[in-house]
């Protein structure tokens, strides 16, 4: 399997999100990289499904709550930016204050 560096990055995000979701299912609070992975994966998959940038910017802030992450994590993450592939091309999606 020949993957480009971009495809490898997407695969790594996806795998990290899978691990983080398993931890959430067990009731474990997420750390910084796990929270970033879940939200980034949500954006990448939403773009693939045909959702708009505006929809993902709004819904990306509803993926995780403060109760699902370790103390201090929401204050550490002010913005998440993900380059996602939409049906009409690649666009940058920014989610402001993603954990509320």
Swiss-Prot record:
Q: Where in the cell is it found?
A: Cytoplasm
Q: Name one GO biological process term.
A: urea catabolic process
Q: Name one Pfam family in it.
A: Urease_gamma
Tell me the keywords, alphabetical order.
Cytoplasm, Hydrolase
| Molecular function via GO | nickel cation binding; urease activity
The keyword Hydrolase is annotated on this UniProt entry: yes
Its Enzyme Commission number?
A: 3.5.1.5
What is the reaction catalyzed? urea + 2 H2O + H(+) = hydrogencarbonate + 2 NH4(+)
- Description of how the protein assembles with itself and partners: Heterotrimer of UreA (gamma), UreB (beta) and UreC (alpha) subunits. Three heterotrimers associate to form the active enzyme.
Q: What protein am I looking at?
A: Urease subunit gamma
User: Which source organism does the UniProt entry give?
Assistant: Bradyrhizobium diazoefficiens (strain JCM 10833 / BCRC 13528 / IAM 13628 / NBRC 14792 / USDA 110)
> Could you tell me the gene encoding this protein?
ureA
């Amino acid at each position: 399997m020949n993957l480009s560096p971009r495809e490898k990055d997407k695969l790594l995000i996806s795998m990290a999100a899978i691990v983080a979701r398993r931890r959430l299912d067990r009731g474990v609070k997420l750390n910084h990289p796990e929270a970033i992975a879940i939200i980034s994966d949500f954006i990448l998959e939403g773009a693939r499904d045909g959702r708009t940038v505006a929809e993902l910017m709004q819904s990306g802030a509803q993926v995780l709550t403060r109760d699902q992450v370790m103390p201090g994590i929401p204050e550490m993450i002010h913005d998440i930016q993900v380059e996602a592939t939409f049906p009409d091309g690649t666009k940058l999606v920014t989610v402001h204050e993603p954990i509320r």
